[in-house]
Amino acid sequence: YVTNEWYGEYGAGTDHDLVKLMQQYPQIIQVSGHSHATLEDARSIDQSLGYTSIQDGTIGAYFENESGKVDPITGTAATRPADSELASQGLLVDVYRDGTVKVHRMNFATGTWIYPDEPWTITADGAKANVYGKNRPSTPAMFPDGASVGFDTAKTTGNSAAVTFPAAKPADGTNNNMIHSYRITMTPKNGGETVYKSAFNDYYYAKAGVGAAGAVPTQKSR
């Protein structure tokens, strides 16, 4: 977080612009604490401002992501995904003699690595290459053949409706192709205003039976 709220002792104002100061040093790697976003989200690293920003997850509190989503059970506004309390993540940072930095993401709840084949890699030039910018290549996910949307009439009221649908399948297992959320569009049959709702996907769920609770992942080979 490098916003007007988080200037720390550097102070606020045009003479104390923390972003402009950090942009003079593209090799900076700024890590934000007190963060609850999921480390599976590829956007947890960003270089679009001219330096590297990383959010480091939560060790033992709860997941909380961006606003604009709804709870899939109640339909109310939600920033916390389902079972958000199943959260314990962190980072292992390796710094090499040539100046290269590799950041490995860990799930402490299961003792496993998060995208183990995709460590975030920052060269000695830092953010100049903007590898982790706003625009990153990805391939759309697909729903299974014959997939359809279900409609639960028993749970339908004058201002709400319950729908079900099968999970989509990502194009592959790479981080940029992770399915982050679903957007549901509903338009009245006889015309009227279209309603849009979004809900988080369960991409942050650890695989059942993998690892041990509270364990640190086995050391990666160098």
Predicted feature residues:
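Recognizes extended acidic, P/S/T-rich segments that occur
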Residues: 167, 177-222
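Conserved aromatic anchor
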Residues: 158-178
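Short, solvent-exposed loop/turn segments at conserved positions within beta-propeller repeat blades
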Residues: 84-86, 176-179
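Ser/Thr- and Asn-enriched, surface-exposed coil loops between beta-strands
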Residues: 153-162, 219-221
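Binuclear metal-dependent phosphoesterase catalytic core
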Residues: 39-143
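A short, structured loop/turn motif at beta-sheet edges
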Residues: 94-100, 156-159, 188-193
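Active-site-proximal segments of metal-dependent phosphoesterases and phosphodiesterases across multiple
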Residues: 1-32, 39-48, 214-218
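Extracellular ectodomain segments of secreted/surface proteins
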Residues: 131-157, 172
